[in-house]
Amino acid sequence: MKKLVLFLGVLMILMFTGCGGKKEAADTGEKKLKVGMVLSTGGLGDKSFNDSAYAGLVRAKEDYNIEFNYVEPASISEFGQFLDDYAAAGYDLVVAIGFNMESPLKEVAPNYPDTKFAVVDAVVDEPNVTSILFNSKEGSFMVGAVAGMMTKTDTIGYIGGIDMSFLNEFRDGYVAGAEYVNPNIEVRSLYVGGSNPFNDPAKAKELSLALKNNDADIIYGVAGGSGLGLLEAVSENEDLYAIGVDSDQDGAVEGKVLTSMMKRVDNSLYTITGELVEGKLENGVRMFGIKEGGISTSEFKFTKDLIGEEKLAKIKAIEEKIISGEVVVK
């Protein structure tokens, strides 16, 4: 059963005075723009890219006075219908979250040439689609360097949702970053798989413990809502640490998430919504990396003392080298 939540914008009625002031859409009688978002499976509460996407559009709703609606599909098979529902209802922008949206959007977008679509983590080559990509390999390189510096066993782990090229970009960047600072590092990789790889915390916890039993003391989880199982595992094991992904997960288990590879889905969706409001949103591929402010590590709020000033300075130096081009993550 689809869960559809409508956020009604607040109608601001401004009185004309000699002082003037900021004009809202209500002043001119303009119709509010409507933005609908189809989340990936796992939905809200994943402490990952769904939550980040939601935060960005809530901010856009408040700042741009738009109407915002979202839906949380129970399965991938529902994606196409929900995209179609929003387009048929006359939404100005329909946002699709996740690489699994590629095929459904390719089918739906051509049927609604006057509707703008945006897709995160996929490329759909249609004249009415904006494809939002992130240089996740750069961010994963950064957190891999953190893991390579902090491991006490020279063995770290990676848990992916499924074994496929898109997610392996995260793994490859993580491995490269760890090897950049620690040539003796070993990286062990496992995958959730199954019928619901991005919303199976129990399986991810099982894999986390398996990696721990094979000497991994730091694990990077790239599996959406399944990553909650990794967080549970580190909360129960004193000598096991996690690295978060997509959003700032550091506070989920304070002091046990060394850092998070933040894919700023929130910033990207806020940006394109502003362009929509201004009539400047264009189709094509948009790439957000560290230099563009689309990728970053979290602020080490709970782990600064654990990591120490010397290592934090080295991490900052690596980031600056990526921005300058001295270090190129391939």
Residue ranges and their predicted role:
Residues F7-I13:
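Core hydrophobic alpha-helical membrane-spanning segments
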